């Protein structure tokens, strides 16, 4: 965001994290920090508003403001699932999807998968599955690989 918007967000108590942090500390560390901040602030649940232009336009071209070097689905999907699983969500929205500028319908498919990942996180939370980075052992190759 521009500086005035960023200042307003800080005045409202919003936490922000930027790509520079991810580049310096790694995606998992920044996610750990963001989740810790939400929990320490007393959040019982989150409302997720996902602006689809955070996804790299190679994967989500159908938006009004495509942002080069955005998140890939491999980064974004686990992030959404993890937020819904570890903190819990009360609702979500995906905004800025414009199918009129995406003849391949790619953006709608990515947006749909984002919703599926959040719903999966909610189901994992309700089922009491283990914490961060949980992967189904049968699908994660545990029968072929030694896990730490």
Where are these regions (language model features)?
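Conserved alpha-helical scaffold segments that buttress catalytic/binding sites
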Residues: 1-148
């Amino acid at each position: 965001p521009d500086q005035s918007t960023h200042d307003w967000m800080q005045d409202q108590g919003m936490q922000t994290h930027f790509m520079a942090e991810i580049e310096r500390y790694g995606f998992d560390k920044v996610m750990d920090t963001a989740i810790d901040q939400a929990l320490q602030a007393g959040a019982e649940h989150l409302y997720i508003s996902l602006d689809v232009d955070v996804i790299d336009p190679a994967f989500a071209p159908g938006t009004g403001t495509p942002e080069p070097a955005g998140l890939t689905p491999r980064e974004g999907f686990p992030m959404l699932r993890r937020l819904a699983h570890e903190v819990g969500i009360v609702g979500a929205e995906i905004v800025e999807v414009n199918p009129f500028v995406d003849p391949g319908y790619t953006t709608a498919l990515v947006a749909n998968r984002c919703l599926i990942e959040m719903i999966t996180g909610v189901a994992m939370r309700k089922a009491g599955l283990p914490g961060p980075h949980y992967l189904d052992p049968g699908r994660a190759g545990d029968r072929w690989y030694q896990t730490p």
